[in-house]
Amino acid sequence: MSLLSAIDTSAASVYQPAQLLNWVYLSLQDTHQASAFDAFRPEPTAGAAPPELAFGKGRPEQLGSPLHSSYLNSFFQLQRGEALSNSVYKGASPYGSLNNIADGLSSLTEHFSDLTLTSEARKPSKRPPPNYLCHLCFNKGHYIKDCPQARPKGEGLTPYQGKKRCFGEYKCPKCKRKWMSGNSWANMGQECIKCHINVYPHKQRPLEKPDGLDVSDQSKEHPQHLCEECKVLGYYCRRVQ
């Protein structure tokens, strides 16, 4: 029994609780087996060492006894179980836990999203046809959406935000009357002749076509009393040019 207590004390400092219980269970089994064999074991002679102290000093055939084999088997089982558990915990996942796996996936997602945004930002803009004229700056070489004078949608009162006179199309929101004018300006409207409300153009384009012709009819008289630009200036707005 002293050997069992010594084994339990030494094992408690080395093995985990689950392994310690397994060791105690195997030790109890070995104790019962040893008591069964002690009934048939001859009495030791005077001066001979006790069986516990003579452990490992016997003959080779004694080392192969059931008691020695049981202790060796239990020791090897514990070693094998410990190595197997370590390999399972170490090889369960390269990230170590589910949280690390989630963090790894999120970082990969951010990495690929950054690559996608970068590729879209570097995508070159399509070149317009040679005869295309931008409706904002009246220059060729780019579309209206790529114009350096373009403002965010909804910031201006009119589509055109430049300083030149342009051709505008109007539609009264009250009476649905439509008209066009060659004296359209940025952020300036014209009064509806029927409803007498100021209407801003919903479409504006340059006066000159690619062939150099004016799209407006210069022979028509401009109603200055309906033009907001003329009211602000105090004189005929076309005189600015």
From Swiss-Prot:
A zinc finger (CCHC-type) spans 132-149. The modification Phosphoserine is found at residues 65, 93. GO terms for molecular function: nucleic acid binding; zinc ion binding. Disulfide bonds: none annotated. Keywords: Metal-binding, Phosphoprotein, Zinc, Zinc-finger. SUPFAM superfamilies: Retrovirus zinc finger-like domains. This is Zinc finger CCHC domain-containing protein 24. It comes from Macaca fascicularis. The lineage of its organism: Eukaryota, Metazoa, Chordata, Craniata, Vertebrata.
